[in-house]
């Protein structure tokens, strides 16, 4: 009898442990992403914009070697995070005309390369503003309700991980068109306030687990070094990095306050320090080159300037932190995701 009781207890423990594991694996039904080229997996492909990359050598390290509209040699963080969450190896672009209803269930990215928190940024670049991405998100939820029911839509809204990634294009480009209205500090503050407003609006639509990326050290991307870093030294554009830091200094406490005010979880995700350390100490992370991109000569090549006619593209992109003159390589993205995701997800789930 004692043996039977012991066996029954062991079975119960096994079932409970297995259920807990199953629950943990199914906690996150989808990944929903908003933002710019860092997270764009092809939303710009059919837009009337010059900011496209659906041609070689973009995608040379993507599965099958296809150029999909991702601003990298391979996958981008939206893909890598989706994989790490156990959802899919790649995250589809919402604007993909071949997307089927079932493709929506594990999440999508609404991100559009070249956009920003400043509405002027998307207008200048002829891309999808973050505010229009919210409109697309409303449409997405309507589709989920129509095809899979109210309960599934509720599950996605309440339990999915929502990511917001923007600010680089505002800081690096649009500010130059806004100097008559803002100095550097006030513009960075305006962007941070816009980011908080965006998160508030996303929360109103039902999102409850939201992570917001900090600005990155955009003054250290190869293009900024080439144009503003000095002909011989090609150092980082420090005034631009200072603007990014000001944006972060404003954004972080504002999101903390919002997290206390609203139900759910709202996280500030510090990407700046990790990427800056990678750029300053590339060998520590297994990289050889940090001040040039792999594509072309790595100084100015981006979008159509990074093309298959350029004979200087490197053969080993994994040795480079940057793929083109503005965007990291897949391997650099992987390092960032591996360094940050578990740390921050533990605060959400």
Curated annotation (Swiss-Prot):
Glycosylation sites: 25, 316
Membrane-crossing residue ranges in chain numbering: none
Main location: secreted
Record bears the keyword Signal: yes
Subcellular localization: Secreted
Keywords: Glycoprotein, Hydrolase, Lipid degradation, Lipid metabolism, Secreted, Signal
EC number: 3.1.1.-
Annotated active site: 37, 324, 327
SUPFAM superfamilies: SGNH hydrolase (SSF52266)
Keyword rRNA-binding: no
PANTHER family linked to this entry: BNAA02G25900D PROTEIN, GDSL ESTERASE/LIPASE EXL3
Protein name: GDSL esterase/lipase At1g59030
